[in-house]
Amino acid sequence: MASEHSAAGAGTDPASAPAPGRARKTAPGRAAKRPRSAADRGKYPFVIGFLIVPLALYAVFVIWPFIQAIYYSFTDWTGLSPDFKMVGFGNYKKMFDDDTFWKSAQHSVTYVVLLPVVVLGIALFLSFMINVGGRRRKGAAIAGVRGSSFYKIVYFFPQVLSIAIVALLFQFAYNPKTGALNSVLRGVRLGSVQPEWLGDPNLALWCIMAVLVWTQVGFFVVLFSAGMASIPSELYEAALLDGAGRFTTFFRLTLPLLWDTVQSGWVYMGILSLGAEAFAVVQIMSVGPGGPADSTTVLPLLVYQKAFGQGQAGYATTIGVALLVITLIFSGLVMRLGRRERLEF
């Protein structure tokens, strides 16, 4: 009895403690907190110290100009005088009633829809042929076409030239009287076929688009070639053993593994189509510029003309805001519709 009483008393004694050297158990569902080390405490100030300067520069030179542009779009600022007054949504109403704006927006949307498709499609085809599309050689399961290194240099060459020089060269080539294109047509006894090229409202936009394609394909050929070179050759060997042809290999193996690069290139090419590249080529090559009959006017050119040619900086920033919205919508759609499961190798 005494032993039972002593045992019971020991079990109910609130002052009882675990035996020395025995770890105290934590309650179920509660994780033991690990004390923060000195490295953990110093990590966040270290990261913040590296980010604060780039973020400050980004805010000053990117975010703040956007805010200013949106503010000036509600004014009648001429761009030459410090004096202006608020006009509310007057500039936006003027923009929606402006036929030239809608023509320019149509041309810009045409560029942003077609240029990425054409440029990336050609670049993917050429990259595949350079890296994978050649005949089998001894000691290599896959190989590119002969002279692939030379082709990479040739395709990338337009990137070395200034866009202004490229536009001037093609402007001379498109000259209906002394240009290279019509001279070639006359040389093959097609003298009756002498298009006006940049002087024809039905051809001018497509002639300029062809120049943009020529200047940009080489960059993406090199970009996609680098991506294809990083794909393990064992994957291609397995596909060949399974009897896959080039068409199947490209769409079932190469393209899925390059999809992240293609998606980024799509956004980048779309921004170029809406930005400085399109503006420079249209400004230099087209009649007017922007002609004939506004057949080649794009939104960046219209912004330039309104701000610096007609002294309507407030209205020009309104068109710039519309261009920003189009760019954001395009980027969002590409990132959303192009989302797919990430493949790793």
Descriptions of predicted regions:
Residues 43-345:
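A structural signal for multi-pass alpha-helical bundles of membrane permease subunits
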Residues 1-41:
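Short, Lys/Arg-rich, polar N-terminal cytosolic tail immediately upstream
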